Structures are given as structure tokens and as C-alpha cells.
Amino acid sequence: MRRQEVLKLLGALPLLALRPSPAAAMGGTLPELDQLAPDFNLESAGQSGALGQRLQRDDFRGSWLVLYFYPREFTSGCTLEARGFQRDLSLYPAADAAVVGVSADGSDKHASFCTSEGLDFPLLSDPGGAVSKLYGAWIPPFSQRHTFVIDPDGILRARFVGVNPSVHSQEVLSTLQELQV
């Protein structure tokens, strides 16, 4: 390698320190456990397709929140995961917990999915991925399959990354029970 090429490479090294980490550039970084969970304020659909209500983290203060991110409605994994949460939904009140889903799909598609699958929990629309990125769950143009358990004070207590949709709701319920002992 010639001296000029080496000097150019050495001169470029400080610029590498200025660029965001690959995780931050892609999906954001996972929020830290035992810290205040990132806030959100997103439009919802749910309870068999009701549209338009905006929900935020603080709406759930005083109870546990299961906030799950998923890539896209009407796909096999996302449908399986949503059905699992719906199947177990009657068990969440015993843990004083609410279930809320988040994806980049629009509210109309959420409403259609809720109606089609008989979902009785809200789905939030994050079309630009801003909230998904705050939770380290964004790879454009989709949210990744991550779940976060937030306590009644808004503190992040558990996170699940790259989940198995067929058993995930049961894993979340088990974790809620462990956290509440």
C-alpha cells in the first residue's frame, strides 16, 4: 500500500466515530431494563375494529403493560402471535396487565385485522417506525418481533427479542408472574 493511501485511510478513521452504530442506524437500540420505558403516542384500532383513539405509555400507569411489536398484519407469524394473545387475553387481567400491539401498518389495516381475527386488544399504528426505533424494533419498513413488559410505574422490566409467535403469550404470562412475586 502506498503512503498516500495509508494517510487517506488514517484521515478517515475519525469520521467512523461520528457515524451511528449499525444498531442505531437500523432498528434503534434496545431500551435498558429498570429504566423508564420510552414514551409513545399512537393511533389505535382494536376492540373489534374501533378506530381513532390515541394511546400513550402513561395511559397504562397503575397497571402492567405488554407492548409487543410485530412486522405485518395478515402474515402467518403475526397472525399466530395475535391469536395467542387473544386466546390468553382473559388471563392478563389476573396479572393486572394490558396487551397492546404495534406495527407500521395503518389504522385501517389494523381495524380490518382486529375484525378478521376477533381481537379485543388495541393495535397501534407506527407508520414511520419512530416508536419502534425507540424500542430497538425497527428494520425499515417493518417493526421486528420484540415484546416489552412495562410495570405500573412505567419502568421497563422485561424484554423479548426475536420471539417464537406460537408460544410467546404463554412466555409473557410466565414472566409477568415471576416479576410480580
Predicted regions and their residues:
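Conserved redox-active cysteine motifs that mediate thiol-disulfide chemistry
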Residues: 69-87
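Short, internal strand/loop/helix patches
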Residues: 100, 111-146
